[in-house]
Curated annotation (Swiss-Prot):
ZnF C2H2-type: positions: 187-209, 215-237, 243-265, 271-293, 299-321, 327-349, 355-377, 383-405, 411-433, 439-462
Cross-link (Glycyl lysine isopeptide (Lys-Gly) (interchain with G-Cter in SUMO2)): 75, 157, 179, 367
Described purpose of this protein according to its UniProt entry: May be involved in transcriptional regulation.
Protein localization: Nucleus
Protein name: Zinc finger protein 766
Classification via PROSITE patterns: KRAB, ZINC_FINGER_C2H2_1, ZINC_FINGER_C2H2_2
GO molecular function: DNA-binding transcription factor activity, RNA polymerase II-specific; RNA polymerase II cis-regulatory region sequence-specific DNA binding; zinc ion binding
Keyword Nucleotide-binding: no
Gene (UniProt): ZNF766
CDD domains hit by this protein: KRAB_A-box
A GO BP annotation: regulation of transcription by RNA polymerase II
A Gene Ontology cellular-component term: nucleus
Domain KRAB: 9-80
Length: 468
């Protein structure tokens, strides 16, 4: 078994360095990706509650100026009056890795440099690829032969995760107790009911509820935490998309979205569901998908009690109560609470149906619609009722069916008090009171209250006319 040693993790350990020559070779998209990776690693350290030195390289990246190395930052950050060392946890003996006199960084056999010690942030270091401790776990594929530029595109990046991160809740080294700790969100916002795992995240969020709101969008009134968040929000409203995919030309308003999209072209899907074998390009997608099998919906709306499998779905639902609609169609002016709803709506104007079935050539506007349609060809029915064993092609069909067992009828007619299991059934029923008949036969002009009656009429009365 590899002998473990303990040392201090520095910002440099999670930094990617470039020489001036390497930096000049990068195009704007690559430079933007570099900034995002560096800032993300910096924020991850800060989220642990660690006091970091005021690195001017971070300020430069926030201001989008031209950094290329953190070497100078490390020189400024060194403390000449302090010893640093690694301790053999088996023998208890310590050995210095930097003395007061020399004050030079020492790189160990694994290529990790010991520099400025960070309080409460220590790693256990072994000869393999896993570094773990009570506060931080570091999972890195380290290779001295990989250049910084290659590291960006090959995915050999540093990920920092701790007891307050949910990204790696299914990581094999975590115990059940640690996983349970990760899932807990003890910090709740009294204004909105939103919950957080990290104590520092709550005051950051509560800024949007305070009277002092300097970062407010003058168009919609939305308040964000900082100027970068306001700039990002403004790009959403204006439709600005500065990041372009070189393969297909698709544009994105965030560099992270571009990086995620590029996996479509490379076919990279490293995360696999053990239940059904489905693969995903991101671990967050896998975690969200697995809740289909476990039926887990931990995110509850404090207003109406509705539950969701992810916080993003809850956030989008919350806008129904607030009436907030951030996304506006430039064609017709219609506004939407979710970006995906706007994207779906825009396809109506363009008439685009990019997803085509290889079996019957039928085309669809959405990938999900194609996936559901293909189940008609392959007979796949992945959603099963635990009460009676009946299977369905769509989760919405399963949810609708389960109301038969529960007896739930949440949709009530305000006119006569009759209740229904589905909203569509209520809408059909209300036409009795309103007299509405929206389905008109273009052959004879007869009108119908229900689409099924209209279809039946065409087949029985005008079948010959329609076929000719």
């Amino acid at each position: 078994m590899a002998q473990l040693r303990r040392g201090h993790l520095t910002f440099r350990d999670v930094a990617i360095e470039f020489s001036q020559e390497e930096w000049k070779c990068l195009d704007p998209v690559q430079k933007a990706l570099y900034r995002d990776v560096m800032l993300e690693n910096y924020r991850n350290l800060v989220s642990l509650g660690i006091c970091l030195p005021d690195l001017s390289i971070i300020s430069m990246m926030k201001q989008r100026t031209e950094p290329w190395t953190v070497e100078n930052e490390m020189k400024v950050a060194k403390n000449p009056d302090r010893w640093e060392g690694i301790k053999d946890i088996n023998t208890g003996r310590s050995c210095a890795v930097r003395s007061k006199a020399g004050n030079k960084p020492i790189t160990n056999q694994l290529g990790l440099t010991f520099q400025l010690p960070l309080p409460e942030l220590e790693i256990f270091q072994g000869e393999g690829k896993i570094y773990e401790c009570n506060q931080v776990q570091k999972f890195i594929s380290h290779s001295s032969s990989v250049s910084p530029l290659q590291r960006i595109y090959s995915g050999v990046k540093t990920h920092i995760f701790n007891k307050h991160r949910n990204d790696f809740v299914d990581f094999p080294l975590l115990s059940q107790e640690q996983k349970a700790h990760i899932r807990r969100k003890p910090y709740e916002c009294n204004e909105q009911g939103k919950v957080f795992r990290v104590s520092s995240s709550l005051p950051n969020h509560q800024v949007i509820h305070t009277a002092d709101k300097p970062n407010r969008c003058h168009e919609c009134g939305k308040t964000v935490r900082d100027k970068s968040g306001l700039a990002e929000h403004w790009r959403i409203r204006t439709g600005e998309k500065p990041y372009k995919c070189k393969e297909c030309g698709k544009l994105f308003n965030r560099i992270a979205y571009l990086a995620r999209h590029e996996k479509v072209h490379t076919g990279e899907s490293p995360y696999k569901c053990n239940e059904c074998g489905k693969v995903f390009s991101r671990i967050t997608y896998l975690v969200r998908h697995q809740k289909i099998h476990t039926r887990e919906k931990p995110h509850k709306c404090n207003k109406c009690g509705k539950v969701y499998s992810s916080s993003s779905y809850l956030a989008q639902h919350w806008r129904i109560h607030t009436g907030e609609k951030l996304y506006k169609c430039n064609k017709c002016g219609k506004e939407f609470s979710g970006h995906s709803s706007l994207t779906t709506h825009l396809l109506i104007h363009t008439g685009e149906k990019p997803y085509k079935c290889k079996e019957c050539d039928k085309a669809f506007r959405h990938k999900f619609s194609l996936t559901v349609h293909q189940r008609n060809h392959n007979g796949e029915k992945p959603y099963k009722c635990h009460e009676c064993g009946k299977v369905f092609t769509q989760v919405s069909h399963l949810a609708r069916h389960q109301k038969i067992h529960t007896g739930e009828k949440p949709y009530k007619c305000n006119e006569c008090g009759k209740v229904f299991t589905q909203n569509s059934h209520l809408a059909n029923h209300q036409r009795i009171h309103t007299g509405e008949k929206p389905y008109k036969c273009h052959v004879c002009g007869k009108v119908f209250r229900h689409s099924s009656w209209f279809v039946q009429h065409q087949r029985s009365v005008h079948e010959r006319v329609l076929t000719n």
